[in-house]
A protein has these predicted regions:
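Acidic/His-rich, divalent-metal-binding segments that scaffold phosphate/diphosphate chemistry
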Residues: 1-90, 141
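Generic structural signal of hydrophobic/aromatic residues within well-ordered alpha-helices
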Residues: 7-10, 23-27, 132, 145-153, ...
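Acidic-enriched, low-complexity/disordered segments with a strong bias for Aspartate over Glutamate
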Residues: 8, 13, 22, 45, ...
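Divalent metal-dependent catalytic cores for phosphoryl transfer on phosphate-bearing substrates
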Residues: 28-30, 59-159
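Generic secondary-structure signature for well-ordered alpha-helical cores
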Residues: 32-35, 52, 154, 158, ...
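A generic structural signal for well-ordered alpha-helical segments enriched in polar/charged residues
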Residues: 49-52, 97, 174
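Charged phosphate-binding loop/patch that engages nucleotide di/tri-phosphates or the phosphate backbone
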Residues: 161-191
Length: 191
């Protein structure tokens, strides 16, 4: 199977929500590895669920930005494919530069450079949600990140942090329960 056919399968196979059309076109244009396409679909799929949950709590987010950010957060790995199967952070600034070169607005491109830096004081809720989706898609729980999200949501609602954290924990547990299926989906595709 050709790399292009594998990417098309990663973008189209049933099981996860489709990426936004502009992101799918971008990945095709970049001849992205199929594994990257599958990974971005998995993270985007979880991000949709998280955004729906946050909005359901009564908190507004920039839905377009969060979902675009989740769908492109690792796009820099087209230049650093070794980071698809190993550690590395070179893809983060590279992804932001790549998106900027392609004319993507800074408010959307920023997630590529910031998704691993959630512990910054100035991290926005939108940025935190992209990072959260990038953890939970594979069943990983990050207590400090979850506490920070709960604090921001609780502050917006005027509720106690513990009450929001309990509801968030329930939602993330539900999402983490689907991690095995998402991992299997991603791992069906070549790097």
């Amino acid at each position: 199977m050709s790399a292009g056919n594998a990417l098309e399968r990663a973008l189209a196979e049933p099981g996860l929500r489709a990426l936004p059309g502009d992101v799918a076109r971008l990945l095709r244009r970049l001849a992205a590895p199929a594994r990257l396409g599958a990974h971005l679909r998995a993270v985007h799929d979880v991000a949709v669920e998280i955004v729906v949950w946050v909005e359901g709590q009564g908190v507004q987010v920039d839905r377009e930005a969060v979902l675009f950010g989740a769908a492109t957060h690792d796009v820099g790995k087209v230049h650093f494919p070794q980071e698809l199967s190993g550690a590395g952070a070179q893809h983060e600034p590279a992804g932001e530069r790549l998106l900027a070169e392609l004319g993507v607005e800074r408010r959307l491109a920023r997630f590529t450079a910031l998704h691993a830096r959630w512990d910054r004081d100035q991290a926005t809720l939108d940025e935190l949600l992209v990072t959260l989706a990038d953890k939970v898609w594979k069943g990983r729980r990050e207590a400090g990140l979850e506490e920070k999200v709960a604090q921001v949501v609780a502050g917006a609602l005027g509720e106690p942090v513990w009450a929001v954290y309990m509801r968030l924990d329930d939602e993330l547990t539900r999402l983490a329960d689907g991690a095995d299926e998402r991992l299997a989906f991603q791992n069906r595709f070549p790097i």
